[in-house]
Amino acid sequence: MDFPGLGALGTSEPLPQFVDSALVSSPSDSTGFFSSGPEGLDAASSSTSPNAATAAASALAYYREAEAYRHSPVFQVYPLLNSMEGIPGGSPYASWAYGKTALYPASTVCPSHEDAPSQALEDQEGKSNNTFLDTLKTERLSPDLLTLGTALPASLPVTGSAYGGADFPSPFFSPTGSPLSSAAYSSPKFHGSLPLAPCEARECVNCGATATPLWRRDRTGHYLCNACGLYHKMNGQNRPLIRPKKRMIVSKRAGTQCTNCQTTTTTLWRRNASGDPVCNACGLYFKLHQVNRPLTMRKDGIQTRNRKASGKGKKKRGSNLAGAGAAEGPAGGFMVVAGSSSSGNCGEVASGLALGTAGTAHLYQGLGPVVLSGPVSHLMPFPGPLLGSPTTSFPTGPAPTTSSTSVIAPLSS
């Protein structure tokens, strides 16, 4: 497939669309320097003038490189595309390769060798990265990470127009217009200026409280504190603001007097057999003894009951348990209590181990009381002989058969 304008790349003459009249000399001027083609360059390099020979040698080297590049199967197409006026962002490509002017003009032409600009870019990028890392170390614990945008350089020295490309919008590719470095976001008070909904100043309509673990609402939608809301939910009415007084220990009734001791203060009013009111002390005394309480037992103060839990019951209970344990396990022996076994062996601690003869008592001294409830035929055998036994094997004698719960008397050594 043939592309228009690409066939001329294989020739040694400059392309018409790449030729600038101000940069390319006329054929008459160029004949004095070198003729067209490498033959002319070779002839010029053999000149007697040292300056002319040096210039001709450099031009010949560049000409051969350009010829090798243009005759290679790979073509550089982007200068041709940039030179087309119909493409957006295209710019005329000045062909400095065919003229006697300087290789690096001051126009917007892209130089062929970008070693110096790339080195400058790398140096500036390295400095920028170092500054950015220093800022990261400085504000590592800072909650406002958006202030890092101020560490970016103010502007980049190279723009898109220097390479013939279209310029991108600055808010996306310019550090000054990026969101990180904008004044609105890099301010230390950025978080405080966010459009958050202000916290409403709530107040309980019943008690006026402004702080509560949980805000509730009444039937009309007004705010209630947690206490008032729970009270209203349980009782269906507002919580009283005045706390109720403590329950009076002494019960006073206007005009009420004990018919036995004539006292007017008591913790509980009672009635006697005839229905007359009596104090608590006289009423209890009459209930227990069926006689009136003597007046000599009257006291001015009211004796209250000490309702604190005492540890006497616990001590008694512990002593009872200790006595029972001593009865079950006398010194020098032990008892085995076992229920009925499906195998018919009572007092069997393990498979192949029976406690029925007095001759084997020395094997089980020092074990203490052992209580086994329920069938014991499922127990696993002991892993080995008991410590302290003079023999190396367990007795396997026959055990007495029984079907009811039995207690073996303590064995004597």
Swiss-Prot record:
GO terms for biological process: animal organ regeneration; basophil differentiation; bone mineralization; cell development; cell population proliferation; cell-cell signaling; cellular response to cAMP; cellular response to follicle-stimulating hormone stimulus. GO terms for molecular function: C2H2 zinc finger domain binding; chromatin binding; chromatin DNA binding; cis-regulatory region sequence-specific DNA binding; DNA binding; DNA binding, bending; DNA-binding transcription activator activity, RNA polymerase II-specific; DNA-binding transcription factor activity, RNA polymerase II-specific. Residues 29-49, 297-325, 391-413 are annotated as: Disordered. Changing H222R: Disrupts interaction with ZFPM1. Binds normally to DNA. A zinc finger (GATA-type) spans 204-228, 258-282. May form homodimers or heterodimers with other isoforms. Interacts (via the N-terminal zinc finger) with ZFPM1. Interacts with GFI1B. Interacts with PIAS4; the interaction enhances sumoylation and represses the transactivational activity in a sumoylation-independent manner. Interacts with LMCD1. Interacts with CREBBP; the interaction stimulates acetylation and transcriptional activity in vivo. Interacts with BRD3. Interacts with MED1, CCAR1 and CALCOCO1. Interacts with EP300. Interacts with CEBPE. Pfam families: GATA. Residues 200-330 are annotated as: Interaction with MED1 and CCAR1. Erythrocytes. Expressed (at protein level) in liver. Residues 391-406 have a biased composition (Low complexity). The keyword ATP-binding does not apply. Changing L224P: Disrupts interaction with ZFPM1 and binding to DNA. Residues 203-222 are annotated as: Required for interaction with ZFPM1. Keywords: Acetylation, Activator, DNA-binding, Isopeptide bond, Metal-binding, Nucleus, Phosphoprotein, Repeat, Repressor, Transcription, Transcription regulation, Ubl conjugation, Zinc, Zinc-finger. Changing S49A: Loss of phosphorylation of the chymotryptic peptide. Transcriptional activator or repressor which probably serves as a general switch factor for erythroid development. It binds to DNA sites with the consensus sequence 5'-[AT]GATA[AG]-3' within regulatory regions of globin genes and of other genes expressed in erythroid cells. Activates the transcription of genes involved in erythroid differentiation of K562 erythroleukemia cells, including HBB, HBG1/2, ALAS2 and HMBS. This is Erythroid transcription factor. Gene3D superfamilies: Erythroid Transcription Factor GATA-1, subunit A. It is found in: Nucleus. Residues 249-315 are annotated as: Interaction with CALCOCO1. There is a cross-link at K137 (Glycyl lysine isopeptide (Lys-Gly) (interchain with G-Cter in SUMO)). The two fingers are functionally distinct and cooperate to achieve specific, stable DNA binding. The first finger is necessary only for full specificity and stability of binding, whereas the second one is required for binding. InterPro entries: Transcription_factor_GATA, Znf_GATA, Znf_NHR/GATA. Highly phosphorylated on serine residues. Phosphorylation on Ser-310 is enhanced on erythroid differentiation. Phosphorylation on Ser-142 promotes sumoylation on Lys-137. Transmembrane segments: none annotated. Residues 305-318 have a biased composition (Basic residues).
